[in-house]
């Protein structure tokens, strides 16, 4: 299955981002993205979608109820044909509409923290009496940025040297994902939540996490069911199918290119399943992890680490059903940081 690298969750001047569509495409090209999914707030500028300067540009939307106070419940809607903003006050009605349009619904930044210094509210998801969502955003770069910005000094450090502070998804978000996985399949995505905002404190001004930087940071690696052909509709649908199936992993490529990372189930030399797939318990079933870079590889079963190895590969014989997923960590600037999170293999 061909691997393509892209970014999900970015904003333009159509809502509260600082970059126009041509500018955001240029940033995507600089980062060598194969695809980019924009998610402007409460609007759906469909006419911008298409192949733009070699980048597959998919237009989705991030919907929320602007009248709700405090603010919460942001939903990323991909593959929808109509603007569903009017349904924002009812999360369940919104989810039902996304599914009627054969779209994909992902809960954005389900867990958030907001220190007082940022003057920004935390915007978590709070209404969990819902059904019909496809997954959650387990790593939101802007959310982590906000959580670490506890003082002017730390904010300046984040603005100019984010990789010295950013370490990975919130533990609370990963725990939430594992709890949800006990009863349903939940696809994990990650993204930058790119806005290109400016930080101003007195005479100092800095762009907060510029688009070109963010597009090299938390990225989505999909395994498509066919190679891109250059036909927009066909290639867009291939990306959306891969996301729906969970045929993807999330990677912090700013600390090491993860292209080629693989997690699969084998019986002997026969590959039976990959990320997002299900496989039955059987004799000689083995889970295999391969990494293009040396890393601290961790295999989790139902949220608990069952095997850990530092290196380029990991193998584990499986006799027990459950949800298996992989986390990988690498050292960067003297600190262990999250690098790769795979979607699960479901052993039934």
Regions found by a protein language model. Name each.
Residues 1-155, 167-183, 191, 197, ...:
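A metal-dependent hydrolase metal-coordination microenvironment
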Residues 1-3, 23, 183-188, 192-348:
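C-terminal functional module detector
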